Amino acid sequence: MTNKMIQGNSLHANNQSAKAKLMGAVRESIPKAFATTKWLLSIMIPVSFAVLLLNYTGVLAVISGYLAPVFELMGLPGESAFVLLTSIFTNIYTAIAVITSLELEGRVVTILAAMCLVSHGFIVETAVLKKTGSSAIRMLLVRLLGSFAIGVFLNWALPTDLIHAQTQVLVQNESFKVMFMDWAWSSILLSVKVVVLITLLMILQRILEVFGVIKLMSKILAPLQVVMGLPESTSFSWIVANTLGLAYGSAIMIEQVEKGQMAKSDADLLNHHVAVSHSQLEDPLLFAAIGAPLGWLIIPRFLLGVLVVWLCRLERGLKKGLNFNSKKSGD
């Protein structure tokens, strides 16, 4: 009887301890989630409004017209430039809306989808990558060159026995008032989504950290991290970026850097990977819904991310060698 009472008291104490840890995780996470949400929305809302103005005034269409010859070199219709440009300044959803307004065959849709998955939301996502330790200009170049590398590869690898359909961009005929109201409503929905997702994600991250799950996940993923050229400390942020994307995953990435759980040099390596390979669940599925095969949207981006990291490591090694030689010659 005494042993049962002792065991019962011990179990009760453990439950109380677990509850205290959970409540503590929630209390610690909410202020940080609010700060990250405020920072993210302060970028997203003004940028989306600026893009609304560029689209309404026809500036995006004019710029895409100048870029059309570059896309034709990859076997894509000239109007494809408008799709990628829209993706760069906005998001995947808008890019899909533009694609579905064009008469494109499956091969072209697949190439464009893969390029958009690498190059979208440049302003917001580059701000995230910069805040976690990378050069903004470098990240822009990595993503832009990466999207064209993917486009060239898929143009070479995909079957070429399909004929390009004639395409034509549908001109925006909506009044500014209608466009503004649509933008305002979508911005409200986006804000709610950002607040909810980031708050829940920050709470989850803190709970996993308190109960030691993150360390366990890091050990399990260690072999894959070695292949990818990424440090073990980046494993959880890598999972978050590949499931939720950079915008929603930014809270975790920033938190880990600020708390010293991930060195900025390690975060920079991670950023080189996730710059071209992130959000490997929802975004590819959205394009799959309009006919693009998932394999061609996921695997090439992952392999490109691995290649970019190893190239970055090679660059760092060469710089260290040059610095060592210069110091030696100076002595």
Identify the residue ranges that each predicted region occupies.
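Transmembrane helix-loop-helix hairpins in multi-pass inner-membrane proteins
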Residues: 119-174, 282, 287-319
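Alpha-helical membrane segments and immediately flanking helix-loop junctions
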Residues: 77-134, 228-287
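Selected transmembrane alpha-helices and immediately adjacent juxtamembrane segments
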Residues: 2-70, 144-153, 157-226, 303, ...
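Juxtamembrane "helix exit" motif at the C-terminal ends of alpha-helical transmembrane segments
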Residues: 50-60, 94-99, 154, 209, ...
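Juxtamembrane/transmembrane-helix boundary motifs in multi-pass membrane proteins
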Residues: 19, 23, 27, 31, ...
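Hydrophobic faces of alpha-helical transmembrane segments in multi-pass integral membrane proteins
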Residues: 42, 46, 59, 86, ...
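Alpha-helical membrane-embedding segments
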Residues: 93-115, 141-153, 173-174, 180, ...
